[in-house]
Each structure stands twice: as C-alpha cells, then as structure tokens.
UniProtKB/Swiss-Prot annotation:
Summary of the function given for this chain in its UniProt record: Catalyzes the reduction of Delta(1)-pyrroline-2-carboxylate (Pyr2C) to L-proline, using preferentially NADPH over NADH as the electron donor. Is likely involved in a degradation pathway that converts trans-3-hydroxy-L-proline (t3LHyp) to L-proline.
UniProt protein name: Delta(1)-pyrroline-2-carboxylate reductase
Organism whose genome encodes this protein: Bacillus cereus (strain ATCC 10987 / NRS 248)
Gene Ontology molecular-function annotations: oxidoreductase activity
EC number(s) given by UniProt: 1.5.1.49
GO cellular component, one term: cytoplasm
Catalytic activity: L-proline + NAD(+) = 1-pyrroline-2-carboxylate + NADH + H(+); L-proline + NADP(+) = 1-pyrroline-2-carboxylate + NADPH + H(+)
Family designation: Belongs to the ornithine cyclodeaminase/mu-crystallin family.
Swiss-Prot/TrEMBL keywords: NAD, NADP, Oxidoreductase
Amino acid sequence: MLVISANEQRNLVNMNEVIEYAALALKEFSAERTITPIRDSLPFANEQNTALIMPSVAEGLEALGLKVVTVVPENKKIGKKTINGIVMLSDFQTGEPLALLEGSYLTMIRTGALSGVATKHLARHNAKTLCIIGTGEQAKGIAEAVFAVRDIEKVILYNRTEEKAYAFSQYIQEKFNKPAYVYTSANEAISEADIIATTTNASTPVFSKKLQKGVHVNAVGSFRPSMQELPSHAIANATKVVVESKEAALEETGDLQVPIQEGLFKSSDIHAELGQIISGEKAGRESDEEVTVFKSVGLAVVDIIVAKYLYERAVERGVGERIEF
C-alpha cells in the first residue's frame, strides 16, 4: 500500500486536471453510475465536532474508496487544522488496500475543484472580481480553482478575525500575484463581487444584503442542518440553485433547510445537480443577469476520484512510501 502525505500531494497537483477529474466524477454521479450513499455525520464532544464517513464506488471509473474526516472548529485556537482525515483507495479488481492519502489537503483541493467546476459553468465569462468570505484553509483551494477558470483581476476578503484575512491577502498576492483587499463589512465586500465564495463554520448568515444581478455564489461551508451561511433570500431569489446531490443537499445543509422551513423555497426549486449541467442535460448560466448559487456539501465520489488521480500521479513519479501489512 502506498502512503501519500499532504506535502507529496501538494507537489503532484495540477488544479486544471483536478477540476476535470471532479467534473467527471460529478457527471458519473448524476448519471446514477456510482454507489455514493449519503455520508454518515457523527457529532462528538457535546456536538461541537463532527466525524464524516464517506464511501463510494464508481464502476465506470474503476474506483473504490472511503474517506473519513473530522471537523473540529476550535482547533484553530490552538494552531491545529480544523479538518483532519484520511482517504483509503482499494484495488478495483482484487479489493486489496491500494493507497492511504492524508485527507485534509485532499479535501481542500477537492472543495476548490468543485467550486471551479461550478464557476466554469455558472459564473459570467467576464467575471473579474472574486469575494471570499472566510479565509481558512478551504479558501486556498477555492481561490486557486476560480483563478483556473476565470481571469480574476481583484480579490476581496472578509473574515471575522481580521488578522487572518490580512494573512490570506498576503498569501494571494505572493502565490498568485493578484491584488487582494480586506474589507471590514461582509455586505460591502459582496457588493463589488462578480463571484462570491463563502467558506465558514457559521450557524447564521454571513451577510444580509441582497445579491446583485449577474453574481455567482459558491457556498461551501454549511454541511449540517444547524449551519447556515447564506441568508434565506439569497436562495429564494436566485435564478438557479445548483447542488452536487439533491438528496444530500436537502438532508445536510441549513442553507436549504432553513428557507424551505420558512416557506421561501421548495426542494423542487433546485435547478439541477452540477453533473447534469456538465453533461448538457440541464442548462448552466444562460444570461449575464442571472443570479446563480452552487450549494456544496461535498460528495464522496469526487474525493475518491481525486484520490485516484493523486495515486496515479504518485506512481508515475515514484512518490510516496510503500508499506506492507
């Protein structure tokens, strides 16, 4: 079995390729060619933390794997990662353990790639300004993926802890050579944006202002019914609301459950799964005036396909540590 660390994965990744693999996984899922159960969400430590168990089989892509991650928001106070985990791949023919990959970096890259796919199909082609609300680790993958599919000229940042936003601003400028500005108001930050990404652990909406015409939103933070990043009117008034999996999104996120409970949105109002747009079954953006929202909760098959991509790259380059059971 090959063990692949976060640093080794970092040196293997080409974001454009990861976006392509994520799109392939989404397309297979929406065509019902995978077995991807709704993940098990296990609260622990008085429900402050969450363990997520995510298996998937993709027959046509010959991929089989399991992801286990923990989300511990308070870790950031002690300088530790809020997301920790592993992804295990099995040999599709023999069932033998094939690889074990560090899971937090893979999650960050996968999360970014999902937003990259959504941005490619749902954001205006002339989008130039990206606003990111929440500047933790997941924001790094989102920024890189959005930069891969749109010619972004300006980045606007908002974070509840301002120092972290300034640190992220420096990261954007140094790694991508793009100007990044820190705002002290989330409402002001979104007012100038063509693309908005929310990646927080918020239980109440992170902004209140109405979305402007033509904007696209990637909302990736809310993965439990008790979490809500977007105000209900953002979902209710959107031209198109798109998800990875209708079943998973309706069960797992307060971003949809709250407006449904308030009578502002119905499950039938979901425009499409992202895989249906990729395949051409459903339309993506159709005009520059549309307001589009991609509500992401994560999807195990995407993790497994991205893990397979990383494994194949590692084998090609002789990267990773082989261990025997």
